[in-house]
């Protein structure tokens, strides 16, 4: 059984914990409380399998605190990560400015592929859902960008996240197959 480690990173108050709870079907937190360090959620998704035989997959979703005071812990969090989801509040201009820093630290420095990264522009309830006006500069404009609004269309983000998990598992399976073939030859 494959086990994938996915990091949820991004600025403070971007909605990482709310999204993580929703996507892993964990309990809801109604009152805001900043994540201290990291919170690890383990889950399985019946829609994601590692091969045609339907072998299940396990996931660890690491909900990482967005405060800069945890920056010294980031290298340890990144160890053995298979994917990174950068969550930001699309309604806060400073979050957009921080995106390149999160991308550099969590995707470029550990040499992950862009396909292993997904951006989520999270819209908090009542904030409106302006999907059209978000333009990102290179290299962020090459990444998969998904808008989430858990109030208006919660299933859209769930389906996009399942697609993302499938791509991570496919990449892991291909890598494992290549490794097995190199051992046999």
From Swiss-Prot:
InterPro entries: P-loop_NTPase. The keyword GTP-binding applies. GTP binds at residues 10-17, 63-67, 123-126. Gene3D superfamilies: P-loop containing nucleotide triphosphate hydrolases. SUPFAM superfamilies: P-loop containing nucleoside triphosphate hydrolases. Pfam families: Roc (PF08477). GO terms for biological process: cilium assembly; intracellular protein transport; intraciliary anterograde transport. Keywords: Cell projection, Cilium, GTP-binding, Nucleotide-binding, Phosphoprotein. Component of the IFT complex B, at least composed of IFT20, IFT22, IFT25, IFT27, IFT46, IFT52, TRAF3IP1/IFT54, IFT57, IFT74, IFT80, IFT81, and IFT88. Interacts with IFT88. Interacts with CFAP61. Belongs to the small GTPase superfamily. Rab family. This is Intraflagellar transport protein 22 homolog. It comes from Homo sapiens. The lineage of its organism: Eukaryota, Metazoa, Chordata, Craniata, Vertebrata.
């Amino acid at each position: 059984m494959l086990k994938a480690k996915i990091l949820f990173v991004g600025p403070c108050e971007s909605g990482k914990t709310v999204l993580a709870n929703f996507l892993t079907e964990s309990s809801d937190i109604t009152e805001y409380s900043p994540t201290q360090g990291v919170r690890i959620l383990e889950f399985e998704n019946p829609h994601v399998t590692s091969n045609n035989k339907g072998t299940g997959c396990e996931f660890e979703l690491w909900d990482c605190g967005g405060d800069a005071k945890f920056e010294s812990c980031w290298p340890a969090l990144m160890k053995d990560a298979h994917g990174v989801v950068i969550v930001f509040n699309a309604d806060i201009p400073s979050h957009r400015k921080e995106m390149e820093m999160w991308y550099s630290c969590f995707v470029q420095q550990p040499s992950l592929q862009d396909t292993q990264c997904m951006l989520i522009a999270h819209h908090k309830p009542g904030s409106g859902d302006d999907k059209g006006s978000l333009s990102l500069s290179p290299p962020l404009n090459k990444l998969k960008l998904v808008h989430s609004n858990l109030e208006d269309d919660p299933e859209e983000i769930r389906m996009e996240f399942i697609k993302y998990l499938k791509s991570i598992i496919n990449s892991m399976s291909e890598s494992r197959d290549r490794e097995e073939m190199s051992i046999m030859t």
